[in-house]
Amino acid sequence: MVIDLVVTKTDDGYTGEVPSLKDCESWAHNEDDVIDKCVELVRFYANLSDETEMKIDRARRSGKKIIYKLIFEK
């Protein structure tokens, strides 16, 4: 399964959201932390175990937005 993670640089940090999962969004002071928090939320909302391998691929950048692809087996 492949889903998008959108990370946006804001004035006070970074926000991350997964548009395909309702209410799956987070905020952090740095990019790595917001990615980690969003991955944890994806695991929760998609009912994935901690052992499920997830690859994070930086796909593209558009202005202040960075699009990542989260790749995992469901």
Enumerate the language-model features and the residues they cover.
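Surface loops and adjacent helix of pleckstrin homology
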Residues: P19, H29, E51
